[in-house]
Amino acid sequence: MRKSISHTFAILAAVLGLGQALGQAQNEIDVDIFNTGEVKAIPVHIEGFTGEILSLLKFDLSVQGFEFVDRGKAQFTIKGSNTGGSVSGAVYDHLKRGFVLNKRYQGGNLRLQGHTFANNVVETITGSPGIGLTKIAFRQFHGRNTEIHVADFDGFNAQRLTSDNSISAGPDWAPNGDTLFYYSYLKHNPDIYSHNIRTGQRRTVARFSGSNISPAVSPDGKRVAMVLSKAGSPDIWVASVNGTGFRRLTTTKAAESSPCWSPDGRFICFVSRAGGRSALYKIPANGGAMSRISTVHVSNATEPDWSPDGKAIAFTTQRGGRFDICIVPSSGGSA
């Protein structure tokens, strides 16, 4: 049975949608959340907050697996205020009948304080770090061209990173959070670059004849997988992040695309048409035989992304003229 999207991958859906943004203001973009109820959400009640901070908290928490209910149905009550230039917040556990978090935030702007409180709420209740202070990268159209932009994960504070006046696309973060890898037609050919967003320094990673696209940085930040066509058909290659030590992993006559790494860095998942249709495959990152990842009930799988715990792979598929996001166990199975 197809699963459109769960809370675990909600942010993935948001990022995929950003590439279609047209004509948005430089400091804010639209991010949509889709909830199909595949994962049981944590029921919480929120009170005391107003305006922008209330909207921020609801966005941050709904993306991370919370739903908002009446106080009588809530497992936790999140209460606080955002007056006087600061945010204060607390979490009451109805099962333990006591407060499990109570903090006041100062310094920075209100949005920063709000995201920080949301992170504290997530970690207090789930034990996992929140993602409220993370960034997203995306491409945005400027006339006929596309440029790379960076924004807060909720779409605010968007800033333009490239001004190549060409096609720039496929951004992928390095684990340090300071560097983006992407490809650009800056030199009239799709070449791969690394770009330090703090210093502005940009370096060429792959510039061969033909396509150099789809960079994906390894979890340890030392290697980058990519699609190169310098040997003929588009294949999966791996190199160091400084653009040395290139190694070809796939040698099929079919086109490969969209590499992504397993969280432990041992495997690379990608799309290949080796079987006639776009399907998911994986291959050892140090070289070896490629094997297919079955996606039962879905015959056309594209754009995979491995879950942080390594248990599942999210991917897109097109049905009836629309794209859906599906999830499959990383070993293959029903999608």
PLM regions and their residue ranges:
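Structural motif
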Residues: 86-88, 144-149, 189-193, 233-237, ...
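Hydrophobic beta-strand positions that form the internal "hydrophobic ladder"
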Residues: 136, 180-181, 221-225, 265-268, ...
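A structural "domain/chain start" motif
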Residues: 22-59
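Residue-level detector of Asp-centered blade-edge/turn motifs that repeat once per structural unit
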Residues: 130-132, 175-176, 219-220, 263-264, ...
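Short loop/turn segments immediately following the C-termini of beta-strands
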Residues: 141, 185, 229, 273, ...
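Amphipathic beta-strand/beta-sheet edge segments enriched in Tyr/Trp
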Residues: 58, 73-120
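Multi-bladed beta-propeller domains
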Residues: 152-167, 195-213, 239-257, 283-302, ...
